[in-house]
């Protein structure tokens, strides 16, 4: 029975272990097991297969590597078989009695030394793969040194484990700048940190350059463009900004905030281009639908290893009216005729502009479920500044202030002449950190309400720093909207930009960096003692919602937000004694 099961097994090309057929994945150029796919990631399997193929040819096989089972079509196996057929015939090895399956008491290194000293390498026939005691179950000889070197070489293809020189020699096409993209891999998929950051910064720089031209054209109402193009752009621009989301994962939300017309390949004169920020509040700008759809497709990880087969319009949905839950396919609004300016956009499909002075309220934080899957993608539910190397890919202050523009003469253009974006407000907060609202020089600065602390989620910093409790997705308050937000939140201290922050429950004054912020209602601010008592009153079981007692839903969703376990642990930490303590 054991021999029957062994004969049914297939060898994984990466780990060289026998696997049952149901544990194998055949969607790549070589058969790999599901364990390797899950561990490495489907987007890196082809790269690792290529690295393993090069290593097997140049490093492992000349030292006596077995050709493996005949069921797999390994190129290295074919090369070795051809070389063995053409080379000089070696004398047959002397039979050495050994117990089956264990190799006896003789070490693998001793057998390797005897084989090399006699001028031969052990290359048994496929019929003896499962019977020779000197061979492992995967067809490899018991040469521990060689096997260990091969294992390290194969695992070394992961970043940080393999020296750059060895990887450059093993992977074809690797230059001094690092890995190049393998065929079939999307440019938006990260390979190595430095290369990905450079590529991301270059892409953002190109997008911002195009966005600058679009904003200049918007200010001039696209003077010099054909009438149909101008009317179409003005009509669509009057609807911006509006939310878009990925059709297969509703937690991936962005927003379209600008439009432009670009030169079109032969056949049409102009082509519609839209600019999307994804994720909301991140400052990452994508020019065109395909780029943002590809990134959302990659973040969703529903179909790993595959790529978009269309322009991306069928993968995105837009919200026709903010907060209504009415989502439609983006292709229904931007049809082929609309994108080529041959016909106007249908009036009944046009989204309604969200009439909110503060653009931060447009996109709420994504639901909790998708925020735990991906580390590379900034889908964290926070509004804290991130100074570590991300400023190069962000929009400039002038472009940030322009990204939530409304039509001149519109109903809100006079009310918000200088409303900054959330990113600009966060930068102001970052510069003002360390200054209490009680300081004399802090009265004229921006309101440090809205959870404008470096408090993010409990996974970002250790609890001993006590800087991370606020779950504020997009609750930043700008100077012009500060009075409305503070008075609406019930601070009761006047509608001045320098008004102190007060707890919604006990009305005590809050320290500017030590409080809990509701991500849905900007006016819900709570001190640590009140939050701690509320959490203790809820008991250990069940979800803990907003300390106000309401189940505040996430913006654009009916699902109420709840504290994460790490945040609860941080709030319940007993070393926080007072509300107004200062950082050293």
UniProtKB/Swiss-Prot annotation:
A Pfam family hit: zf-C3HC4_IRF-2BP1_2
Subunit annotation: Interacts with IRF2. Part of a corepressor complex containing IRF2 and IRF2BP2. Interacts with JDP2.
Cross-link (Glycyl lysine isopeptide (Lys-Gly) (interchain with G-Cter in SUMO2)): 227, 438
Keyword Transcription regulation: yes
Molecular function GO terms recorded: transcription corepressor activity; ubiquitin protein ligase activity; zinc ion binding
SUPFAM superfamilies: RING/U-box
GO biological process: negative regulation of transcription by RNA polymerase II; protein polyubiquitination; regulation of transcription by RNA polymerase II
Name by which UniProt lists this protein: Interferon regulatory factor 2-binding protein 1
Chief place of localization: nucleus
UniProt feature, compositional bias: Low complexity: 449-463
Assigned GO CC terms: nucleoplasm; nucleus
Catalytic activity: S-ubiquitinyl-[E2 ubiquitin-conjugating enzyme]-L-cysteine + [acceptor protein]-L-lysine = [E2 ubiquitin-conjugating enzyme]-L-cysteine + N(6)-ubiquitinyl-[acceptor protein]-L-lysine
